[in-house]
C-alpha cells in the first residue's frame, strides 16, 4: 500500500466524525438545504481527503442522477456522495459537486449533527 497524503485545511472546516480528517471549508458550501437518510446534508463545491466509489444511477427526489459514494481517505467511513451526472437540466448545477451528510461529519466548531427543525429542507436529494 502506498503512502497516505492527507490535506490539512485552514479556517473553519468540516471533518470526519470518526477520525477528524478534514473534508471541506465553510466557504465551499453551496447549499445547506439538502437532506439524506440520516437528516441534513450540505452541498459543497470542493471536498478533499475522500476516495470516490463506483458510479451508479440513482433515482432521487429531484430525478435521475449518476452519483458515486465518497469515503474518508483515513478511516474509510461513508460520508456522502459526488454528483457525476444530473439528467434534468434544472439539476445540472450539481454535477461535479459533493454532498456531505451532517450526521457523519463534525462541524467547524467541533459540533456533530444538529437537527434544527426551524430550517426548511428544500432542494433535498435523497433516494426515493
UniProtKB/Swiss-Prot annotation:
Q: What is this protein called?
A: Protein yippee-like At3g08990
Name the family: Belongs to the yippee family.
Known Pfam families for this protein?
Answer: Yippee-Mis18
The Yippee domain is annotated at 12-109
Could you name the domain of life of the organism this protein comes from? Eukaryota
Disulphide bonds annotated for this chain are none
Q: Which PROSITE patterns match?
A: YIPPEE
UniProtKB keywords: Metal-binding, Zinc
The answer, when asked if Oxidoreductase is one of the entry's keywords, is no
Instruction: Please tell me where Zn(2+) binds in this chain.
Output: 16, 19, 72, 75
Enumerate the GO terms in the molecular function aspect.
Answer: metal ion binding
Q: Which InterPro entries match?
A: Yippee (IPR034751), Yippee/Mis18/Cereblon (IPR004910), Yippee_fam (IPR039058)
Amino acid at each position: 500500500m502506498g503512502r497516505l497524503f492527507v490535506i490539512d485545511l485552514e479556517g473553519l472546516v468540516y471533518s470526519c466524525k470518526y477520525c477528524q480528517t478534514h473534508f471541506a471549508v465553510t466557504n465551499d458550501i453551496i447549499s445547506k438545504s439538502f437532506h439524506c437518510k440520516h437528516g441534513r446534508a450540505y452541498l459543497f463545491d470542493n471536498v478533499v481527503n475522500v476516495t470516490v466509489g463506483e458510479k451508479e444511477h440513482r433515482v432521487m427526489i429531484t430525478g435521475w442522477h449518476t452519483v458515486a459514494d465518497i469515503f474518508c481517505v483515513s478511516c474509510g467511513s461513508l460520508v456522502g456522495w459526488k454528483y457525476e451526472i444530473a439528467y434534468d437540466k434544472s439539476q445540472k448545477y450539481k454535477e461535479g459537486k459533493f454532498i456531505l451528510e451532517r450526521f457523519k461529519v463534525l462541524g467547524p466548531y467541533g459540533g456533530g449533527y444538529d437537527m434544527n427543525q426551524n430550517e426548511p429542507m428544500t432542494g433535498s436529494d435523497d433516494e426515493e
